[in-house]
Amino acid sequence: NILQLSNSESTLEINTLLLGCSTKSNNTDTVGQFGEGYKIAALVLNRLRKTFSVYNNSKDEIWISKFERSEVFNEKVLMFEIIPNHTNNDGLVIEIENVTLDEYNSLYDVWIGMPDAENHKAIETSYGRIFTEKDMRGEIFVNGLAVEKEKNLYFGYDFKPQYITVERDRKSCSTWDMRSTTSKMICE
């Protein structure tokens, strides 16, 4: 019941623990730039009694999120304990414990990059992929992450992040960007 999300190319700097700090701010190849993502995820998952740990291998550290009582605020606050962890591994692994099978299976609905996910027929373009199967009509993804469903679209789309502005909650995107980019994709 452990879910691991890994990226052999990634590393996190300590300042990204601060809300609003991000390593993605100027990276058009990634989704997210607000510096809130993994911190909010850690907060929500801890509230759901899941463990959320970051194996920041390139820094030889493990960051373990947990609630602790703050003497300053007299409240439980989310904090990260940083533990030295000398390893020969590279990259970043985010580990979430206490994941049920139903929770794991629900990830197939929101991320098309899941292991053993259905391989949908698609046309590759420089802007992303156009899904041609009927069951993918109106499905909108950015970099594989489900963003929204647009009933007026004949095809489904997986946009490269540099062409679409995703809203802070990642549940919607700029309609103008989407319409402009879909027309460019179809013209290709």
Outline where the language-model segments fall.
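GHKL (Bergerat-fold) ATPase N-terminal catalytic module, capturing the glycine-rich phosphate-binding loop
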Residues: N1-E103
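GHKL/Histidine-kinase-like ATPase module
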Residues: K76-I82, I96-E188
